[in-house]
Amino acid sequence: MRSPFRVTSLKPFALGLAALALLAISPLAVSAPSAAPADTREMKVVQPQDVHALIAANKGKVVFLNFFATYCVPCHTEFPDIIKMARKYQNAGVQVVEVSMNDNSDPSDKGAMLKWLGETNPPFPVYIASSLEDDFYKGVSPQWAKDGEGLPMTMIFDRDGKMVHYYQRALTLAEMESDVTPLLAAK
């Protein structure tokens, strides 16, 4: 005797189940926070004159200007400390400005940069250099060009926009703080 509950095809059942699953999770997708993930942020391309304009625009603050790249091992060591320092001193008058020296014309290199930013989620603006040619380095700092264009490179500016510290190596959090705190105290 034949069963009245005989299944002739599982295809409609599977499609119906899939539709129910999508319907069930769709309210979660709608109610998720609207903030875009950090790795989708746009990175503005900067020329040397833009870097100088960023320093001038932050007159009255201590500017911590750092150049780095995702392929730079010391940069990976230093970056978490820069984030800690930025979070600790951002309300005290420190502005961190980061410029990536990844190749902005290479989609995979720029993609690596965006991925890294998504993973680290820095609380400061990150730009990308317009060029990796000597003119960019010279335009930012003749000293940097003369010293071999190494990374990471940091320049720290006082509240008047005068460069008071220059490093072409990774800094520790303690070194950053020992440079920044006296500049914050000087008004």
Language-model segments: residues:
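N-terminal secretory signal peptides that target proteins for export/translocation
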Residues: 1-10
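Bacterial N-terminal signal peptides
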Residues: 14-27
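N-proximal helix/coil linker or "cap" segments that precede and/or mark the start of modular domains
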Residues: 25-45, 115-118
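A short beta-strand-turn-helix
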Residues: 42-63, 86-89
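Short pre-active-site segment immediately N-terminal to redox-active cysteine/selenocysteine motifs
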Residues: 61-63, 68-71, 150
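Hydrophobic beta-strand anchors of alpha/beta hydrolase catalytic cores
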Residues: 64-65, 96, 154
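Structural microenvironment flanking redox-active thiols in thiol-disulfide oxidoreductases
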Residues: 79-121, 133-141
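Thiol/disulfide oxidoreductase modules built on the thioredoxin-like
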Residues: 120-122, 129-179
